[in-house]
Amino acid sequence: MHRLLQTQPKNFLTTFANLYNSMNKINYQKELDRVIEKITGVGKVPKLLLHVCCAPCSSYCLEYLSKYFDITVYFYNPNISIADEYNYRLSEEKRLVSLMPFEHPVKVIEGEYLPKDYFEYVKGLENEPEGGKRCEKCFRLRLESSARYAKEHGFDYFTTTLTISPLKNAQLLNSIGAELAEKYGIPWLYSDFKKREGYKRSIILSKEYDLYRQNYCGCVFSKRDSVTAEN
């Protein structure tokens, strides 16, 4: 089989690889369901470190997960290099948490804000398209910080709100999370929050709480691409 594939043109191999990956995608919502079923009714509420990118994306995730976890929001986003934008998104997250009703405690902590770390980490990838290699590195930077913090502070799980976006690759995010879970010895909570209309629910909650909804992901490169697309 492998020898046969090696004789095919490159475009055939690419098509085959894409087809194979699409047929073997993991349903991460079902993985999350299994964890929730396991922890429900055991008498102890597990501690979850939830990496949050912005208030709108976190709205549904918090509504959903706070039924089962004691959550600490980890706002670590050095990719947002414009300080005013960063501070506004952080203040909106804090405001949302102060307003939403939760079954279990939710608090917000801020990770170290050093945009230079982000620029050094993605150096050479400045002209990559949105969703490409630069974004993959950005995911890894933020999730690695989350994994390290979760391990050092005794959390039971860590995860991110990033999978709620239709523009973010949940397969990639969960793959990175699982890799870091093994590296740091802290369980990764699988997710695909856009499932079960989670993204639509986040839009409803954003309107309900009058949340600031930015039109770009966060870095200056995504802002550049957003402006280009609008023109």
Name each model-derived stretch.
Residues 2, 6-8, 20:
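Low-complexity, intrinsically disordered or signal/transmembrane-proximal segments
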Residues 6, 13-14:
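Intrinsically disordered/low-complexity terminal segments and short unstructured peptides
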Residues 12-13, 19-60, 65-231:
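Nucleotide-activated chemistry modules centered on ATP-dependent adenylation/adenylyltransferase
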